[in-house]
Structure formats: C-alpha cells, structure tokens
Amino acid sequence: MSLLKVFEAFSGYGSQSIALERLGIEHKVVGISEIDKNAIKAYYALHSEDIPNFGDISKINPEDLPEFDLFTYSFPCTDISLSGKVEGIVRGQTRSGLLYECEKIIEHCKPKYLLMENVKNLMGKKFRPQFQEWMNYLKSLGYNSQCFVLDAKDFGVPQSRTRVFLVSVLNEECYLTLKTKELDTFIYDIVDENDESRNFIKEIPELKGAYMNGAYRGRKKDGKYVQTLEFRGDYCSNTITTVQKDNVVVLDGKVGYLTPKECFKLMGLRDEEIEKIAKVVPKSAQYKLAGNSIVVDVLVEIFRPLFLESGQK
C-alpha cells in the first residue's frame, strides 16, 4: 500500500505508530493531540520531534489539520473504568466525554480508517447504549465498523488486560480475522530479580524461595477496608494500571512492586524504547504512562490484517 498518513489523538507515547513500525508499514504521523507533559516528552523521545502536537483536542480546529488516512482515538477511560469515578461519557463535562470532540475531526477530515480503544466496561450495561449510539453515528457517516474485546494474554503477552477496540473503514466492508498467540513468555521471564531499583514493601518468611505474583486489594474486614495480598496462579500480571499497588511480585520471600521497566515490557515496548523514555520521564510518572497505554502486540495483530493481508486494502 502507499504511504499511510496517521493522526494519533490522545497519543500517549504513540503505541499505534510503534505497532506500524513493528510491521514495517510505510507511514508518516502527520499530527498528534496530547496534553500530558510526560506523555509528550516520551512521545518525542520515541518519535520524530518534527511531528506537530495540536494539543487539547477540544480546542482543535479541524480545518488546521493536514490530510490523513488513519485516525486513532484512545479517549480517556477516567469516567468509564470501574477503578475511576464512573461519571460517564458526558459531552463537554467529563474527561471521557472528550470522545465527542473527535466528531468534528472525523466529519471534516474523513479519514479512511479509524481505531478506537478503551476499557472493557465500555461494553458493560451502563455504557453499551452510548457505545452503540457512537457506532450508529459512524455508520451514518459511511463507516462500517467491527468491534473486538481483546485480552493481551491471548496475543503472547503475560498480562491480563482486556480492552475494547473498534475498527472502522469508510465506504468499505470491515471484516478482520485476528491471529492469537499462545503464551510462551511469562511474568517470571519479564521480572529482573537483580533489579536494585525495585521497591519492596514487606517480607513473608514462609514464602522464601517461592516466586509468585499478584496485587494488593482493598477488602472489607471487621467493618474496615484493609490491604490484602492476592496471588495469581497463571503466571500473568494483573492489568498494568497507573498505580503500583495493582502489580506485585514475591521474590525470595520479599514482596515488591513491578518496576517501570517491567511494566513497559508488559505493554510491548523494547529495551531501547524503555531506555529512551526513562531518560526524559521521572520514575513515578512512568507507571502512569504505561498504565494509560495500549499493548503494542495487540495493535500489531489488528493492523496486520487491516493493512497487510488480503481482503482489506
């Protein structure tokens, strides 16, 4: 295919363009929309500094945007996620309501391809009607859409992370067959037992010599919420979030948090990419960057049939 021009809204550090690079797809990012200062630093550490950032999406005039073929919009999950305030997708009022700011861009620029990503709760009882309305809106513009609910661990990544993806194609049928991959890399392949930067929080002598992973969860006990250590048995991490407590490992009887490097690896980044981010973003902010991003390996398997395989050109 010819050069693919891309606009990444709510870009983070640019997982979508990283996935395109992994596939060797000739592309050019013609613009991004991002307001988080650390995400912007990370983006330009990984990508060309010549890519213009149009800033706050609510203030973008679509007439100022260049032409592009692919529009990605992983809008904020703050008001949808069960771990957030769940205040809903409210136009002009909530962070998740920024979804509707994408309308002006889609209507004016009419990109051939759209890719949306958000948390699983978007398909829940509360938000499903709004999600259906959004798909109906896209249909009215001529877009045919295909929805996927995908877990990163089904794509060879040892992280239990389920997300909703919506692929839309203008004036053409959209029918993609995604290839999954069995896990051959596990959490203990990711964790560096010798990393001295790890923050340990407690010691459990009876687990000395054991390797386990899990999370601290708030559980009610005697009328009070207490932090309880819960373990997983499938050698996958819990969903990488913006906070540390959701992922811990037990190394030789000591309970410690995953490091930012390990979190980024579980999001599909390579060592050299992680090092570039670490040079410009403080450690405390790296957890948020990883937690807000998209697993590269999943994006690769969406883009592969969309842009490389027969049936979708």
Where are these regions (language model features)?
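Conserved active-site and SAM-binding loop architecture
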Residues: 1-313
